[in-house]
């Protein structure tokens, strides 16, 4: 919704929690508006055409000195995080579009948003899918198009190697990878060249994967 709202304005900026998600959104904006209209700004990548009108950024990299008609910040509940929370809190307090501002996140942020912005319109949207416990499974017996979430780089690589030995292939997605490598790994999985994805829990922050 935020992307469509942004593209309905003459200029816009969106702050996202993950570099990989920023790249995904950037590709969508380029497809809709062309390369000259879109900028990608993260801690690792900067693609900034001179006359760009839409800025897709990680939250930390948002150029707040630039006035835009529409501004959105995604996953504002990260304001509670001990490491990154101060940045999200600053954006929640100060980042605004001069025509429209959209703050997206967990319903747990409703009381805080209501206190800070008493006139804000709060819209609750139901999740498009449900999460269900399927029981214990051996990793080597998982069905194709499965994603495995691990919580350290060592576990990610170990599980990916296990899947490669027994099932033929797995893509790896972690924040520690270079942008080019991350994007290539996502493409491998999305294009069906491998049937398994092994990632850190960061994929739960809005990445759209065909799992």
Predicted regions and their residues:
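Helicase motor core with emphasis on the C-terminal RecA-like subdomain
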Residues: 1-73, 77-211
């Amino acid at each position: 919704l935020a992307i469509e709202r942004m593209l309905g304005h003459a200029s816009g900026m969106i702050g996202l929690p993950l570099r990989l998600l920023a790249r995904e959104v950037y590709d969508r904006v380029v497809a809709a508006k062309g390369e000259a209209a879109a900028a990608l700004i993260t801690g690792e990548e900067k693609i900034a055409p001179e006359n760009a009108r839409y800025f897709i950024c990680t939250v930390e990299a948002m150029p707040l000195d630039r006035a835009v008609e529409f501004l959105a910040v995604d996953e504002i509940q990260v304001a509670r995080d001990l490491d990154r929370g101060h940045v999200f809190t600053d954006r929640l307090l100060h980042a605004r579009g001069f025509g429209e501002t959209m703050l997206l996140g967990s319903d747990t942020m409703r009381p805080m948003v209501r206190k800070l912005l008493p006139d804000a319109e709060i819209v609750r949207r139901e999740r498009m899918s449900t999460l269900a416990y399927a029981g214990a499974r051996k990793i080597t017996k998982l069905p194709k198009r499965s994603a495995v979430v691990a919580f350290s780089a060592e576990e990610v690589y170990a599980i990916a190697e296990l899947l490669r030995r027994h099932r033929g292939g797995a893509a790896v997605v972690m924040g520690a990878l270079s942008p080019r490598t991350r994007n290539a790994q996502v493409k491998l999985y999305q294009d069906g060249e491998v049937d398994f994805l092994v990632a850190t829990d960061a994929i739960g922050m809005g990445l759209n994967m065909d799992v």
